[in-house]
Amino acid sequence: MGNYWLNFYKPRGISSAKLVNIVKKIIGKTKIGHAGTLDVEAEGILPLAVGEATKLIQLLIDARKTYIFSVKFGTQTDSGDYTGKVIASKDYIPSQEEVYTVCSKFIGNIRQVPPIFSAIKVNGVRAYKLAREGKIVELKPRNITIYDLKCLNFDKENAIATYYTECSKGLI
């Protein structure tokens, strides 16, 4: 049995809590927690603490995070991600220089309004659930820190840039 950490890949379409429940059934442990929440439509590594290791979760939650993400230029959706309905579009696509140089403007302490389709809880309910029900959710800006932000690739033909960031909790 024991006390340990597991790094699980969380695919798109499943909540962090559901992944924890699946792992509980597989390994037969009831004391499992996750270090942070990935939105349902996000994919990536979700650290799971088992047994007494759950006492260390807060240390990992407060640690710096790294993400790789893509941005599609020229399209705005109602959800802020690829799953939403397109609500606006523009023909303007930034230049390669603009895509790469904009990064420095975001380094440091900034205020971020989380997207309405996020896993943040509003009165005990995930914001994305309220948004899918058509309820208007106003999320308050949060202080976050971006330690590093780099453009890794820019596909001008498809208007997609891929970025790397190192940040405090609560960024994406």
Curated annotation (Swiss-Prot):
Keywords: Isomerase, tRNA processing. Belongs to the pseudouridine synthase TruB family. Type 1 subfamily. The active site is at D39 (nucleophile). The keyword Glycoprotein does not apply. Responsible for synthesis of pseudouridine from uracil-55 in the psi GC loop of transfer RNAs. It comes from the Bacteria. GO terms for biological process: mRNA pseudouridine synthesis; tRNA modification. Gene3D superfamilies: Pseudouridine synthase. This is Putative tRNA pseudouridine synthase B. The keyword tRNA processing applies. Its EC number is 5.4.99.25. Pfam families: TruB_N. It catalyses: uridine(55) in tRNA = pseudouridine(55) in tRNA. NCBIfam families: TruB (TIGR00431).
